[in-house]
Amino acid sequence: MALERTLSIIKPDAVERNLVGKILSRFEENGFQIVAMKMLRLNQAQAEGFYAEHQGKPFFDGLVEYMTSAPVVVSVLEKDNAVKDYRTLIGATDPQQAAEGTIRKDFAESRRRNSVHGSDSEESAVREIAYFFVESEICPR
């Protein structure tokens, strides 16, 4: 097993509904160490930059509008096999398809308002973490 990092974003719908504490508890209960965290409100340029790979897709503008609608909580999580384990913990993008007990099944409102984002690969995790954090902001434990 290899110690990995992954990026988590608690999205606007979950922040607005005061679910941040419940979601962070799920991370820790499942063995993740929170090694960096910040709350911020993304501006349009930040959201477009983060989701640049989706530019030109029909859902892009709505995604950017949603991600800039309220604050988000961005964190770096660390554990063995973090990327895979986090994806399992959050569940399928569509909460109706998500397994019982996953964050999206328990908290998400819809496919877009699905409460959390998680890196989909180790390569994405490295890129996404660097988008929001400099190495000196990450505090391994």
Curated annotation (Swiss-Prot):
Highest taxon above the source species: Bacteria
Protein EC: 2.7.4.6
GO MF annotation terms: ATP binding; metal ion binding; nucleoside diphosphate kinase activity
GO cellular component: cytoplasm
Swiss-Prot/TrEMBL keywords: ATP-binding, Cytoplasm, Kinase, Magnesium, Metal-binding, Nucleotide metabolism, Nucleotide-binding, Phosphoprotein, Transferase
GO BP annotation list: CTP biosynthetic process; GTP biosynthetic process; UTP biosynthetic process
Annotated PROSITE patterns: NDPK (PS00469), NDPK_LIKE (PS51374)
Reaction(s) the record says it catalyses: a 2'-deoxyribonucleoside 5'-diphosphate + ATP = a 2'-deoxyribonucleoside 5'-triphosphate + ADP; a ribonucleoside 5'-diphosphate + ATP = a ribonucleoside 5'-triphosphate + ADP
Active site: 117 (pros-phosphohistidine intermediate)
Family matches, as SUPFAM superfamilies: Nucleoside diphosphate kinase, NDK (SSF54919)
A Pfam cross-reference name: NDK
Entries under InterPro entries matching the protein: NDK-like_dom, NDK-like_dom_sf, Nucleoside_diP_kinase, Nucleoside_diP_kinase_AS
Names of required cofactors: Mg(2+)
Keyword match Transit peptide: no
Subcellular localization(s) per the UniProt record: Cytoplasm
Residues annotated for ATP binding in this entry: 11, 59, 87, 93, 104, 114
Record-stated family: Belongs to the NDK family.
HAMAP family xrefs: NDP_kinase
Record's subunit section: Homotetramer.
Purpose: Major role in the synthesis of nucleoside triphosphates other than ATP. The ATP gamma phosphate is transferred to the NDP beta phosphate via a ping-pong mechanism, using a phosphorylated active-site intermediate.
Protein name stated in the entry: Nucleoside diphosphate kinase
Organism: Actinobacillus succinogenes (strain ATCC 55618 / DSM 22257 / CCUG 43843 / 130Z)
